[in-house]
Amino acid sequence: MSHPALTQLRALRYFDAIPALEPHLLDWLLLEDSVTKRFEQQGKRVSVTLIREAFVGQSEVEEASGLLPSESRYWLREILLCADGEPWLAGRTVVPESTLCGPEQVLQHLGKTPLGRYLFTSSTLTRDFIEIGRDATLWGRRSRLRLSGKPLLLTELFLPASPLY
């Protein structure tokens, strides 16, 4: 199963440098903290619609080439993050199999728990970069994060109903 928002997410084109944008847009796109938490601060009940969660081969995560270690298997999680039931964000997380050892194994078992609830409670979380992307009228971003030094790639597309717009 897929979702049209995930097709748009995969079509994001990334800027080489941070573009000159309105402060409101940059505030969302360069957010270092949890998007889940920011959505909750809007007074909304945040929930996850799980689209896909499975091990996949390299061919299904080509966008991670050069950004993550080359491995034969990756854990892929695709979701819609909803606020009061309305989709505000499409998310795609790519995790190399080698990252899934020790406490990071929990990444395979998040189910309908927002990724941010796990990531931003970890004292071992670091972020290597945030890249801003765009597809038509929608904005997104991708980040390489590390848990205990082990990488994962998170891509987020802000959907039309989100407060970014």
Swiss-Prot record:
Record flagged with keyword Lyase: yes
Localization per Swiss-Prot or TrEMBL: Cytoplasm
GO BP: any one term: ubiquinone biosynthetic process
Documented EC number(s): 4.1.3.40
Key words, A-Z: Cytoplasm, Lyase, Pyruvate, Ubiquinone biosynthesis
UniProt cross-references to InterPro entries, sorted A to Z: Chorismate--pyruvate_lyase, Chorismate_lyase_/UTRA_dom_sf
Family label: Belongs to the UbiC family.
HAMAP family named among the record's database cross-references: UbiC (MF_01632)
Subunit structure of this chain's protein: Monomer.
Protein name listed in UniProt: Chorismate pyruvate-lyase
Source organism (scientific name): Salmonella typhi
Gene: ubiC
